[in-house]
From Swiss-Prot:
The keyword Oxidoreductase applies. It catalyses: (3,5-dihydroxyphenyl)acetyl-CoA + O2 = 2-(3,5-dihydroxyphenyl)-2-oxoacetate + CoA + H(+). The gene is dpgC. This is (3,5-dihydroxyphenyl)acetyl-CoA 1,2-dioxygenase. It comes from Amycolatopsis orientalis (Nocardia orientalis). The keyword Kinase does not apply. Belongs to the enoyl-CoA hydratase/isomerase family. Substrate binds at residues 184, 190, 223-226, 234-239, 293, 322-324, 413.
Length: 434
């Protein structure tokens, strides 16, 4: 078994054929090695050296040809491919640029510590596409379009006003879409299923003409520590990250560019000339806590009500990953000093302290939550509210700024989830409650 890194002989300005041949040689090296955790130091060095070189070449290639690649994959930007569809199309049309479906299937069968880290190559590709001035905005638009699952469920929801899914349920009452996180066994910890259910629910709420306002709240838990109590969200499911079941494309990126971005911008349609999207006001209600991804969500809602015994945290430093788009949004609410304390230092903010009012609009006793929610929903119900929240969001979060952030996030988060520190930390967390 060789431990020599292949000589790739890559030169600046390489064409796709040369890139594909070099990628094949790297794959042959990796296929001949044991799994990452079983490699000798020499084997690790050989793999790392080869991957560094091919990834530098992939970066150069996609940065030079992003618009051309995207135009080919989308027939001149006439087709709207979602993230997962785009990376699969790229794997077929540009061998060696991103991992093949077979390679990704093999990765999905392994724990995080046993993976080769091929999602990093997807991150390189998506950073290049999102950074491109024409391709990037088109990809954002593609991710704002309703999902096929939502379109299939829409007639049922319009008729009955109820859709129940594994991780979320949606009920329409008096013009309000009540969206409830209902993973009662794991404190609403986030995984790919939750992201799929949440995007479906957000699409339905936005597409249903009878819905005027949306509301998100955590359901009642069966988890022993919070049995009988409502919980908003415990953040990313660290057990699933350790087991290799938190994907870059279908969770970490889809979450940001899918349902969260739709809460901000609305769902894209081919309808009225008045607006390219259907958007509506949203309220969040926080019981018990909003940790990690739960706290990130609060930054995109128009009104937040919290119980006085709740708390908020972004434990990025503890978990080792990037807290979604919180690094982009949080300082607008808190200022840069407090944002750094929360993100870099892991500061927890309780609802009863003054700084909490930078994150939430109302703090009420737990027994008054229902009344406060209904009052706030009534205040959000109006055409003028909808028009003004659209303009506020446009001013506070210009699409190009968000796109540039997400371009870099695509790669940096991919690198983080394969960092040795993250793999070690989540392995320890896996024995905990999430």
């Amino acid at each position: 078994m060789t431990t020599d890194s292949p000589t790739l002989s890559l030169s600046p300005g390489l064409d796709h054929r040369a890139l594909a041949k070099a990628a094949q040689r790297v794959d042959e090296l990796l296929d001949g090695l044991p799994s990452p955790s079983a490699r000798t130091p020499a084997q690790r060095e050989a793999a790392s050296s080869a991957l560094d070189e091919i990834r530098a070449a992939r970066t150069e290639y996609v940065e030079a040809h992003a618009e051309e690649i995207y135009d080919r994959l989308t027939d001149g930007r006439t087709r709207y491919l979602r993230l997962d569809e785009l990376v699969r199309a790229a794997a077929s049309a540009y061998p060696g640029l991103v991992p093949t479906e077979a390679q990704m299937a093999a990765e999905r069968s392994r724990r995080q510590a046993e993976k080769e880290g091929r999602e990093i190559d997807q991150g390189i590709f998506l950073r290049g596409i999102l950074s491109a001035p024409k391709a990037g905005p088109h990809l954002l638009d593609a991710m704002l379009r309703p999902t096929a699952r939502a379109l299939e469920l829409l007639p049922e929801f319009v008729e009955t006003g109820v859709v129940r899914m594994e991780a979320a349920s949606l009920e329409r009452r008096d013009g309000v879409a009540y969206l409830t996180l209902c993973r009662d066994d794991c404190l609403n910890a986030e995984d790919a299923q939750q992201v799929d259910d949440m995007e479906t629910a957000v699409d339905l709420a936005l597409l249903d003409p009878a819905v005027r306002v949306g509301m998100l709240r955590g359901g009642v838990m069966s988890h022993p520590r919070y049995a009988g109590r409502r919980v908003f969200c415990a953040g990313i499911n660290l057990k699933k990250l350790s087991s290799g079941d938190i994907p870059l494309v279908d969770f970490l990126l889809r979450r940001e560019l899918g349902y969260i971005h739709k809460i901000v911008r609305g769902v894209a349609t081919d309808g009225s000339w008045r607006a390219r999207v259907i958007d509506k006001p949203w309220l969040a209600a926080v019981d018990s806590f909003a940790i990690g991804g739960g706290a990130q969500l609060l930054l995109v809602f128009d009104h937040v009500v919290a119980a006085s015994d709740a708390y908020f945290s972004l434990p990025a430093a503890t978990e080792g990953i990037i807290p979604g788009a919180a690094n982009y949004r949080l300082s607008r609410f808190t200022g840069p000093r407090l944002a750094r304390q929360v993100i870099l230092g892991g500061r927890r903010i309780t609802a009863d302290e003054p700084d909490a009012r930078l994150l939430v609009d109302q703090v009420v006793p737990p027994e008054e939550m229902d009344a406060a929610i209904e009052s706030a929903l009534a205040a959000l119900d109006g055409d003028a509210v909808r028009a003004n929240r659209r303009m506020v969001n446009l001013a506070e979060e210009p699409p190009d700024g968000f796109r540039r952030y997400m371009a870099e996030f695509a790669l940096q988060q991919a690198l983080r989830i394969y960092g040795a520190d993250v793999i070690g930390k989540v392995g320890g967390f896996a024995a905990g409650s999430r």
